[in-house]
Amino acid sequence: MTITETMLVPNFEDEAETGRKIAIICSKGNLDMAYPGLILANAALGEGVETHLFFTFWGFDMITKSRMHDLKFTPVGNTATHMPMGITPFPGVTGMATHQLKKSIADLGVPEVPEFLEQIVGAGGHLWACRLSADMNHLTDADLYEGVEGIISASDFIEKTAGAQLLFI
């Protein structure tokens, strides 16, 4: 786009489809890194934006039935927690930090990860699982959250989301 071109500004009062699309790649399975992608997806859907989430590598934990209810938050090596790094590896610290984060999130009325995924799918969001990650972890569709539309390759995801804004989390 050049300076002389008119910027595309969506008309949110128009009921017609905006043509906007966002693709969010969720690559982390920690509790604290699950929420940014889910919150952005929810916000995009609220604005009428076609929304696709692609779960890969550790982000697969967010959609794996056996793990999605038990995501953890570990402060080890995370200086943003403002905790003394010397105590973070001690037994119980991850459990305490996970409990505190879950409480803080719940106090704000934000749903837990499985309910958030359900909300996103209910609003028309699309969930995709990475074929390579599924194969590496010996997982099939039966192991995944029911709202996942399929296990696809990275190339297939790129094709499905052609022209989308892309976020890697």
Regions found by a protein language model. Name each.
Residues 35-48, 53:
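Histidine-anchored nucleotide/phosphate-binding helix
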Residues 166-169:
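Short hydrophobic/aromatic patches at helix-to-coil boundaries
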Residues 23-34, 63, 104-108:
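Short, glycine-rich nucleotide/cofactor-binding loops
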Residues 51-57, 128-131:
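Short internal beta-strands
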Residues 96-159:
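A charged, amphipathic interaction segment
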Residues 63-73:
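Glycine-rich loop at the start of a catalytic domain that most often binds anionic cofactors/ligands
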Residues 2-14:
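Positively charged, low-complexity intrinsically disordered leader regions
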Residues 71-105, 109-112:
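A glycine-rich helix N-cap at a beta->alpha junction
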